[in-house]
A protein has these predicted regions:
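Composition-driven recognition of glycine/serine/threonine/acidic- and proline-rich low-complexity segments
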Residues: 1-155
């Protein structure tokens, strides 16, 4: 999969897929796609569907598969930026709720519960967040300006 992030306040990510490659996303993120992209919708099982409903996320996930070379574009739902992140062993990522935009099919999206009550009550993001694990490229939407910090172990 090759990609390019374009745009200003409401950016998009254009993904070029080879035959058989797949992308996952939650509802409402896809902007346009070539006719040879096939969409399937999955719930992920009753337990996962219940957990997603509890967290306020969509209970269903869309999977887009390329039947030959294809293109698909995903767009941000609010002003800000799109960031590409490589997910892999030791490179899992915890996101604020609703930050997940799209990912290659090898990336697993799940919910993450904060364990500290004070952080959940006063931290501004609540107790429920999103977790990306597995392996592949993921795209997250950042509301507002993106500032990056490189943290060391334990920070």
């Amino acid at each position: 999969m090759r990609y390019e992030i374009k745009g200003g306040s409401f950016p998009i990510v254009v993904c070029q897929l080879e035959s058989g490659e797949q992308m996952i996303t939650e509802k409402g993120s896809m902007v346009w796609m070539t006719p040879n992209m096939q969409m399937d919708t999955r719930g992920g099982g009753l337990g996962k569907m219940f957990a997603k409903a509890f967290s306020g996320e969509s209970m269903f996930q869309n999977i887009y598969a390329a039947r030959g070379q294809g293109m698909i574009t995903f767009g941000s739902s609010f002003p800000g930026q799109i960031k590409a992140v490589e997910i892999g062993p030791g490179r899992e990522m915890i996101l604020q709720k609703s930050a997940f935009l799209a990912a290659e099919a090898g990336v697993e999206l799940s919910i993450h519960f904060k364990k500290k009550i004070g952080v959940g009550l006063f931290g501004g993001e609540g107790f429920i967040m999103q977790k990306l694990s597995g392996r592949g490229m993921a795209f997250v939407e950042i509301d507002g300006e993106l500032v990056e910090y490189e943290l060391g172990p334990g920070e």
